[in-house]
């Protein structure tokens, strides 16, 4: 299951989702995309979305979850509530890789974004804009890393 942001708006985050889907397809992995609502980031909404997904897929037709940190953790919680095991029955991988993926049990495998570097680049670009520099379709790409947790390995 691939939790993705809303396609109702144009956003650079679509690139990571399209690339994820392409690579999974290339590897012969079938994905079910669950599209999250635009601009909804609260835990209650994530709980609703995860429950909605699990209710729709009442048969265990999936063995993995890929979503933001909070979505992946809520999926892990729902798997456990339904008396299944992580990672034996369902593996969970988060993207963002904030500290919360390390303080839950089991710790969540995460694609870690370089938050400090993202903040520095954002501040640099804002300062340059304030000082009169103009950009057209400026794109900054920073590398990510994988931090292995216990949600993908037994």
At which residue positions do the language-model features occur?
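Flexible loop/turn connectors
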Residues: 54-154
